[in-house]
Amino acid sequence: MVVKFTKSEALHKEALEHIVGGVNSPSRSFKAVGGGAPVAMERGKGAYFWDVDGNKYIDYLAAYGPIITGHAHPHITKAITTAAENGVLYGTPTALEVKFAKMLKEAMPALDKVRFVNSGTEAVMTTIRVARAYTGRTKIMKFAGCYHGHSDLVLVAAGSGPSTLGTPDSAGVPQSIAQEVITVPFNNVETLKEALDKWGHEVAAILVEPIVGNFGIVEPKPGFLEKVNELVHEAGALVIYDEVITAFRFMYGGAQDLLGVTPDLTALGKVIGGGLPIGAYGGKKEIMEQVAPLGPAYQAGTMAGNPASMASGIACLEVLQQEGLYEKLDELGAMLEKGILEQAAKHNIDITLNRLKGALTVYFTTNTIEDYDAAQDTDGEMFGKFFKLMLQEGVNLAPSKYEAWFLTTEHTKEDIEYTIEAVGRAFATLADNK
């Protein structure tokens, strides 16, 4: 059992003197789980982390999804090392970027053409620009609670109803930008139709997480994505899939392959970089030809397509092509789901568990979670206590009730068995302190 965080606490105190909030992304802070110093990790290998105090953890954070092959996978590490030895940045075309683009196209047939960028935020931001250029329209639709990066246009909350325009979800986002965004509930065809009836003639595109990963793992209802395509295309707008989390996570060809629904544009990130910074976007040839130098929609990047990220991404996809890999993730996910539910029943802890293959979310509620409102109405205080108990047990989760547990190819049945036992001990403590 982990009992000391002395060095993490000291490091966080020092970090507060030099780094805003002591972290380089707010999701790493422990603010959402009752506060305290976040645990600072020193190294990772396979499914495990070791922190600066020497404590070992089974890792289900997986860097919020990208580390599907585990930490320091030898094939990926070798590719990165070779790329570094050859020079990490040229500012010129390379053979690696062509090879990687071909691999992405082969995996996802909806990608006639692709372009590499440096993050998922950039990828989404640029698909919006391209959609606006192609349609000549300005407004964007999105689903409530779905995170699409931190660019101004997507940091927008819902208005007072489905036919109202959005409001800024962050300081520094002008109201004028928020007025270009319509936010509707996920999994609700009627409100989508109502919004399109009012604003459809001004909408350039709708942003869709085909499987939600940002208020937990939430699947679309049967037929929902097909209806989104139908209604949005009837309005003359485009469908953009944000597959930054989902691509290569649940299936090699992404959520669009798993679900059998095809978007006009796709944004990628996370997993495709093998742990290095990356993003990509792509789609139909006639739409992508809006992008400079062929078309009027400008997008550029000094680091885009850099050899290190390309080599890492190629190596990651080569690992993910191994036979039986996704079946293993599903098998371990099912084992973990069954064990957590059994422990919840044993200790009389109310939870709802959403799982798809090797990713799951534990919500402290008895309600079904199909949209953001339901996810919001869950017990965050209880989750915060659970999170810290699991940390003491040597199990690393994301410090937010909205995030997923991500399995990697390196987790074992023994890891799952230990995790279930740890969940049982945590639930027992929560039950004793009700």
From Swiss-Prot:
The modification N6-(pyridoxal phosphate)lysine is found at residue 270. GO terms for cellular component: cytoplasm. Keywords: Cytoplasm, Isomerase, Porphyrin biosynthesis, Pyridoxal phosphate. It holds the Pfam family Aminotran_3. GO terms for molecular function: glutamate-1-semialdehyde 2,1-aminomutase activity; pyridoxal phosphate binding; transaminase activity. It is found in: Cytoplasm. Its cofactor is pyridoxal 5'-phosphate. Its main location: cytoplasm. Pathway: Porphyrin-containing compound metabolism; protoporphyrin-IX biosynthesis; 5-aminolevulinate from L-glutamyl-tRNA(Glu): step 2/2. Its EC number is 5.4.3.8. One of its GO terms (biological process) is protoporphyrinogen IX biosynthetic process. It catalyses: (S)-4-amino-5-oxopentanoate = 5-aminolevulinate. Homodimer. Belongs to the class-III pyridoxal-phosphate-dependent aminotransferase family. HemL subfamily. This is Glutamate-1-semialdehyde 2,1-aminomutase 1. It comes from Bacillus thuringiensis (strain Al Hakam).
